[in-house]
Structures are given as structure tokens and as C-alpha cells.
């Protein structure tokens, strides 16, 4: 019996994978700052294995190259753990409320990448609570530097895909997010 991935216990203790990733990044920045100031530190308790070295001339598929580039590597192989920087994040109105709640709990002050919020699922005949969400969610997204489309502007995939470049890595808050170029990962 083995637990896969190796980080699952740490993810549980941290309250989830996102919190573990944030904790590791904060810890790494704090350690770097302490080293610059000459302050002695201990190694962090939670470490994930570094990607195994790839041999010189290792062939990669286009998808492996795109994800690797977004993670600062020439490519990735099956079993590698990487944290690629997404170029685009799509959000739609039915999941946007949960996204806002998570970001508020994390005290987010701005988006790290291009964030596009659409209102394509409730635009046709919004109930009064939908209209309120459309207004308040758009204000929230704009305040954090994202792009909030207006109700009736169209479907997120059509509008969002206009922002894609061939090397982009992105994600969207539903099961059918896909980019016509680049690579995308559905989050729903």
C-alpha cells in the first residue's frame, strides 16, 4: 500500500493543494530574504521532489514543451511535478462566485495573469440574484485587474480564445475549456 502522490499528506495538513503551494512559495521567499540578510534558517519541512533530469536531446511532444516552457524548463515528462505559470485563466458566472470567495479568503490583491470573467451562463434571463452577482463579480474582477465581460458579450470560450497565442498555457472553470492554439486544462 502506498499513497500517491507523495505530497498528499502535506496537502491534507495544509487544508488543500492550493494552500500547500502558497505556503511553499511564501516559505521559499522568506528563506531567500533571510539568506540575503545573513539570517540562519532551517530547511522547510515540506519538500517536493525536483523533476528528474532529462537527458541531453530528450524529445518532447508539443504539449510537454508548452507546459515545460511555462514552468521554466525545456519540457516535462510523465511523473514530473511542476507549477507552470498560466498565461490565461477563464472564469464563468456559475463558478465565478466560488472563485471570488477563494480569492477573498486568500486576501488576493491582484491577478498574477490575465483573468477573464464572463457572464455567458446567466445572461439570457437573469434572476434578480444573478443580476446582483453579475454586477458585484464584475466590480471584483476589475478591482483585481481582470477583464470582466458584460452579460450578452458572448460565450467565454469564443471571447477568451481571442486572447490566445501559440505558446499559451491556460485553464478555465468548466469541463470544456479548450484553446484553438497553445494548451489548456479544464478545471471543472
Outline where the language-model segments fall.
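Fe-S-dependent hydro-lyases/dehydratases of central metabolism
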Residues: 1-188
Amino acid at each position: 500500500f502506498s499513497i500517491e502522490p507523495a505530497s498528499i499528506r502535506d496537502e491534507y495538513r495544509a487544508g488543500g493543494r492550493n494552500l500547500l503551494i502558497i505556503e511553499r512559495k511564501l516559505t521559499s521567499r522568506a528563506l531567500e530574504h533571510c539568506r540575503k540578510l545573513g539570517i540562519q534558517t532551517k530547511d522547510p519541512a515540506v519538500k517536493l521532489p525536483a523533476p528528474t533530469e532529462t537527458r541531453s536531446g530528450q524529445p518532447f511532444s508539443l504539449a510537454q514543451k508548452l507546459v515545460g516552457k511555462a514552468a521554466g524548463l525545456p519540457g516535462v515528462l510523465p511523473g514530473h511535478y511542476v507549477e507552470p505559470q498560466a498565461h490565461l485563466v477563464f472564469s464563468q458566472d456559475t463558478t465565478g462566485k466560488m472563485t471570488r470567495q477563494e480569492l477573498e479568503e486568500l486576501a488576493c490583491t491582484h491577478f498574477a495573469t490575465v483573468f477573464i470573467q464572463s457572464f455567458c451562463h446567466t445572461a439570457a434571463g437573469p434572476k434578480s440574484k444573478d443580476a446582483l452577482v453579475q454586477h458585484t463579480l464584475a466590480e471584483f474582477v476589475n478591482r483585481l485587474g481582470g477583464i470582466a465581460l458584460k452579460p450578452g458579450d458572448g460565450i467565454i470560450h469564443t471571447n477568451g480564445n481571442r486572447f490566445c497565442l501559440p505558446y499559451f498555457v491556460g485553464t478555465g472553470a468548466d469541463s470544456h475549456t479548450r484553446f484553438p492554439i497553445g494548451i489548456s486544462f479544464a478545471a471543472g
